[in-house]
Amino acid sequence: MKKYLILGDPINTAAELNLTVQDPPYCLFRHLNQTFKEEIMAVKVAKFGGSSVADIIQLRKIKDIIKSDPERRYIVVSAPGKRFEGDNKITDLLYLVKTTMENMLPFEQLFQVVCDRYTAVHANLGLEVDMQSAYDEIKEKLRDNPSADYIASRGEYLNALLIADFLGFDFVDAEGMVKFDEKGRFLMEDTFEAIREELAKHEYAVIPGFYGSLPNGDIKTFSRGGSDITGALVAGAIGAECYENWTDVSGFLMADPRIVKDPKQIRVVSYKELRELSYMGASVLHEDAIYPARIADVPINIRNTNVPEDPGTMIVSEERAMELKAGDDIITGIAGSKDFTVVALYKNMMSQEKGFVRRILGILDDYDIGFEHLPSGIDTVSVVMSNKQINGRLDEIINEFESRLRPDSIDIIENIAQIATVGHMMSARMGTAAKLFTALAEAGVNIRMIDQGSSELNIIVGVENKDFNKAIQAIYNAFVEK
């Protein structure tokens, strides 16, 4: 898909082109001295994680990747990760610097270890950027005992300086673009506006991930892994053609490889499918790293820096996923987790009693417990809770159910695992649920709970913890073509 660079004010320019500023196929952010309405190349945002920028070998790989496609114009980088087994991530070393300072111990030698890592890269690649000035500035601030967020963020900051010089791109600090309010709450709209305004000045740029700033200028970080969020923010703000997330795996797998040997790769997954898989325990991108791209309808491509020819996994809208998956496996993936408790409440004429479920939720709220599912019948409702959230308070919760709900009986089923079979294609095939239940029965797995939404995006079954691996293998064998 081609895009147009819109020059000047996006509202007025879009009107002249008979476009809308909300239309994601159009980039409303560039200001170049080119002919008005000039059609140009699409824009991709590429984020490279810690393993992809860990050493000189990896940096040369990412340079080849970036230079192989001129559409890769905005690059977001993490701090360097581990180079080998037993090595330290730069971010971990920086947090250790903060701990050392808090214990009133000298931090200079430990911080020098961090600097030496960047200096070695600088020297071996023959770079020209003045890293010593950056080190000195950070050292000066360290003497004022800055926040842990500031110290941890310097890993991405220093790495982006190096990589910008290595690529010949501009360095653009995320500090001025990623916005938080005075209470540390992220400001999406302000961030999008700041990114568009700043990147309008840069044709090619490297941006450090992981952090932004508070209104007073102090550094504020996202949670660990926040560089994924920064990449999605840049892609969403400019309406990129694609957000490429480069890491050390070739996308997502249809099942946990620790359970299923050599599971197939997921080539296409919708945002909704990914959320279902993530919620049920699959190791995928955090929702916060998906949302900024999803609302702008920007596809996300998970790629492997070490195998750049592999197309990886595409995360797209539901409509696009259905188009791309024609002829693929019925299911997209299988995920699950163990250690849940099911509390089944029985009460005659429950369906006629107003506010029953509301009172259940009120009790859970009193104990700060989020329910996983609430499958129900005419006179029954089952509350599925994680043992971690129950935290040894099951007897107290049951007592509250009895006194405030007055059920006829309560059944408790402990040590339950939940398994979600996810896929938009399931709704288009008759007998999907029957096939799943048959596969589990033939494997000798007793189903203790079933929950299927009306959208038929997923089927969740509850099995005993001991049958968890066996159940996932059985479902995979039934649905995935060899």
Where are the language model's segments positioned?
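Nucleotide/pyrophosphate-binding catalytic subdomain
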Residues: Y4, D23, C27, H31-L285, ...
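Acidic, Ala/Val/Gly-enriched low-complexity intrinsically disordered segments
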Residues: D9, A14-E16, V21-D23
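Structural motif
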Residues: V43-K44, R72-I75, D149, F169-D170, ...
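Internal nucleotide-binding/catalytic subdomain
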Residues: C242-E244, Q265, P299-I302, V307, ...
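A conserved regulatory-domain signal marking ACT and ACT-like small-molecule sensing domains
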Residues: P311-K482
